[in-house]
A protein has these predicted regions:
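N-terminal glycine-rich cofactor-binding segment that shapes the pocket for flavin-like pterin cofactors
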Residues: 3-4, 9-53, 202-208, 212-220, ...
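Aromatic/hydrophobic pocket-lining residues that form the small-molecule binding cavity
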Residues: 51-54, 58, 108-111, 115, ...
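Alpha/beta enzyme core
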Residues: 89-130, 142, 147-159, 178-186, ...
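Alpha-helix-loop-beta-strand connector modules within alpha/beta enzyme cores
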Residues: 30, 50-69, 142-165, 203-204, ...
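Active-site-proximal loop/short-helix segments
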Residues: 10-21, 74-96, 125-148
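Catalytic-face loop-and-helix region of soluble metabolic enzyme cores
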Residues: 157-280
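Active-site-proximal, glycine-rich beta->alpha crossover segments in alpha/beta enzymes
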Residues: 22-121
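Short beta-strand segments at enzyme active-site cores
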Residues: 4-8, 71-74, 123-134, 164-170, ...
Length: 280
């Protein structure tokens, strides 16, 4: 392996707002967020106290890792947290947010400041960077995502931890321009699309881009999986070493629960073998 990641469930911060989280087997809340949950001011001390297990886990992990292995942190994106907290995680698109004062207060006055504290805590406890996993931000209208939501994240999180945040959103509009990584002060982004990374990568000037093997391929029988893997490797083998610079080879999303372990191992071994040979 090359890097260890603190994979702490992204929904824990919602418990600080009064929701009770359970798993059956997926996440289930006893209720959803309401106005009363936003009225009580949550202090930095309370936020850090309720999430201090993350700092402890990071310190333990760092002490166990060899010095040549990296350690990165992990939080949920504010919109993704809110979509779960409102019980709206399965909706395709959510519109009219600029007219909904409750949603905007929850986002900008509560969740973003809360996540800023948690990110700082992780960075102060040996995380080299922190991934912001915001897959449900795809629910936002493109104009609102760029002009309102991302501007707020840029001003209140990305700029405060410049070069220390990696951002993931499914179908991320920022992937239209590789320069957005540096323009938003990010360390990198995850390429949450199935196609196009091999065209994006040669234009990358700063930071890293991660992806983008489709996770569902890992569920397939060996022969079908091998076809997909061959196609993936061929696409990136056509690029020069310089053009591949900044690429973190991975899936375009997380590993699915029923992924075949032999396919995961095969993916890692084939990718390393092929691209190590190309580097020689």
């Amino acid at each position: 392996y090359d890097v260890a990641i603190l994979f702490s469930d992204i929904l824990f911060p919602l418990e600080s707002l009064g929701l009770k989280l359970d798993y059956a087997p997926g996440p289930v809340f006893n209720r959803f967020l309401n106005e009363n949950d936003l009225s009580a001011q949550i202090s930095s001390t309370e936020i850090l106290e309720s999430n201090k297990f993350q700092a402890e886990a990071l310190n333990i992990t760092r002490n166990l890792l060899p010095s040549n292995k990296s350690l990165v942190g992990f939080v949920g994106g504010p919109w993704t947290l809110l979509s779960y907290g409102l019980g709206r995680k399965d909706e395709n698109k959510i519109t009219g947010i600029e007219k909904n004062s409750f949603i905007e207060r929850a986002l900008y006055d509560v969740l973003i400041p809360m996540l800023r504290e948690i990110i700082k805590m992780q960075l102060d406890n040996h995380s080299e960077i922190v991934y912001v996993f915001d897959t449900n931000a795809k629910q936002l209208e493109k104009d609102y995502f760029i002009q309102n939501y991302m501007e707020n994240l840029k001003n209140n999180i990305f700029s405060e931890f410049e070069g220390k945040i990696a951002y993931f959103c499914k179908d991320n509009p920022l992937l239209s321009n590789p320069d957005n990584i540096s323009d938003y002060g990010l360390s990198g982004m995850v390429f949450g699309k199935n196609d196009g990374l091999e065209k994006f990568l040669p234009n990358l000037n700063n930071g890293f881009i991660q992806g983008n093997f489709e996770p569902t391929h890992l569920l397939k029988p060996r022969d079908e999986f091998e076809i997909e893997l061959d196609h993936f490797i061929q696409n990136f083998s056509r690029l020069s070493t310089e053009e591949r610079s900044g690429w973190v080879c991975s899936l375009n999303h997380g590993v699915l629960p029923k992924a075949k372990e032999e396919n995961v191992k095969r993916f890692i071994n084939r990718v390393r073998t092929v691209f190590d040979q190309l580097e020689d």
